[in-house]
Amino acid sequence: MSVSAFNRRWAAVILEALTRHGVRHVCIAPGSRSTPLTLAAAENPAFIHHTHFDERGLGHLALGLAKVSQQPVAVIVTSGTAVANLYSALIEAGLTGEKLILLTADRPPELIDCGANQAIRQAGMFASHPSQTLSLPRPTQDIPARWLVSTIDNALAMLHAGALHINCPFAEPLYGDMNDTGLVWQQRLGDWWQDEKPWLREARRLESDKQRDWFFWRQKRGVVVAGRMSAEEGKKVAQWAQTLGWPLIGDVLSQTGQPLPCADLWLGNAKAVTELQQAQIVVQLGSSLTGKRLLQWQATCEPEEYWVIDNIEGRLDPAHHRGRRLVAKIADWLELHPAEKRKPWCVEIPRLAELAWQRVVAQRDTFGEAQLAHRIRDYLPEQGQLFVGNSLVVRLIDALSQLPAGYPVYSNRGASGIDGLLSTAAGVQRASAKSTLAIVGDLSALYDLNALALLRQVSAPFVLIVVNNNGGQIFSLLPTPQSKRERFYLMPQNVHFDHAAAMFNLRYHRPENWEELESALAGAWRTPATTVIELVVNDTDGAQTLQQLLAQVSHL
């Protein structure tokens, strides 16, 4: 019997089973113990293959692919710390709902806890963060193939959102020519190999329940809060709220067009908060809210009912309001709960939103970080997409810009870490094949610098704007101790990114004014390649401008 040949047949069943559940993208890191899985994926024509030498970046690449494709994405890594490097992407997927299938190769049980090389306790290492876990046995013909395929099918059928971790131990030898070992074992699956359906088909009901008292609540004074959702859902939510006459507070990721722009500015005005206190119901569609003032208002508002609608299960209201948690796709829920045409009940908030917008526009000519956030809608590629980093940049765009309704916006706002942002953006571009604008800070770019290797392979123009404010300037917005701020919070690195771009043979520009930036962008959008644009800005201007605008708008 050939161990290596049967390992490959076992792995081939696993990978083929994944194709029956919509898996098309497979992300592969180099490794020896994962050879059976890698070869099975490489030989399966149903897959699009992606490779990367860094498992942490690989996991985030898969995350980006899943965000756009809305299908599960498989990741293959070898044993040991390679597995641990998937942790941050797995956590993010658990919070934002993308489906990742983590296929982690492992040593067989007899090599665990005995000093064997590259052998760690992988089973259960991700604790409660995966949505599903599956620890497979060592490949053996004593276990029928139908058990293996039905086990994979069951795990995937139960995966509603987040990650499925499948730990796959393989004994040596891992290499060798294929022979007839295990062929009969494999053939017992019959015509399943030619079919396109799962071996085990499990129906899942995910239908929205209609709230029978909706006709009553839609006649009340309501507020709509729009969090993360798809571009199509964003347009529908905006129209729904407009018909109801309810004010819509749209997050940067809502894609609603933010009809009341600069919400994180005007929510700092007491007149706005007073008017919102008249709301009898708040309907929040989507989660992962960004704005600090929005979160503060959400935490203190006390409507009669607070509804949260999202297709991700679990509690999504950190303020723990009395109300309803409804698990449903946003578009489906809107269809079941039509709006009734009513006059807008808010008067003060539209006025404040307009005045806040005017204050922001008045500062747009200065070359700086806050002004870039405001201008970002002018730089979006036509029929393209935007990827927004974390920390200060996403807050500035949320507070100071007004993105077009229905324009695709992506980000990692689940755990909101700065790890893997460039890798995620690379996955977003690969899955969509669209022109992409990504914007991150300098520390975020440094944190995922080797992901520039992934950006050498793009199918449409990709522009990475690195806002270099020399450190983590978001801490300038927080009451960090002044004497300790620079060394222990901001951590300025005093670096530029021209050499990094050159290392990976990427185009590079460092504009010093708006005209130079617009010229660099015009050239970049004509070229199906990656262009790194570094904006070197004054360290504290972005945070200070936001604070100044907050003070101005609060006194309107």
UniProtKB/Swiss-Prot annotation:
Family: Belongs to the TPP enzyme family. MenD subfamily.
GO molecular function: 2-succinyl-5-enolpyruvyl-6-hydroxy-3-cyclohexene-1-carboxylic-acid synthase activity; magnesium ion binding; manganese ion binding; thiamine pyrophosphate binding
Record's protein name: 2-succinyl-5-enolpyruvyl-6-hydroxy-3-cyclohexene-1-carboxylate synthase
Organism name: Salmonella gallinarum (strain 287/91 / NCTC 13346)
EC number: 2.2.1.9
Known partners and oligomeric status: Homodimer.
A Pfam family it matches: TPP_enzyme_C
Co-factor: note: Binds 1 thiamine pyrophosphate per subunit.
Top EC class of this enzyme: transferase
Reactions it catalyzes: isochorismate + 2-oxoglutarate + H(+) = 5-enolpyruvoyl-6-hydroxy-2-succinyl-cyclohex-3-ene-1-carboxylate + CO2
GO terms (BP aspect): menaquinone biosynthetic process
Functional note: Catalyzes the thiamine diphosphate-dependent decarboxylation of 2-oxoglutarate and the subsequent addition of the resulting succinic semialdehyde-thiamine pyrophosphate anion to isochorismate to yield 2-succinyl-5-enolpyruvyl-6-hydroxy-3-cyclohexene-1-carboxylate (SEPHCHC).
Alphabetic keyword roster: Magnesium, Manganese, Menaquinone biosynthesis, Metal-binding, Thiamine pyrophosphate, Transferase
InterPro entries the UniProt entry points to: MenaQ_synth_MenD (IPR004433), MenD_middle (IPR032264), THDP-binding (IPR029061), Thiamin_PyroP_enz_TPP-bd_dom (IPR012001), TPP_enzyme_TPP-bd (IPR011766)
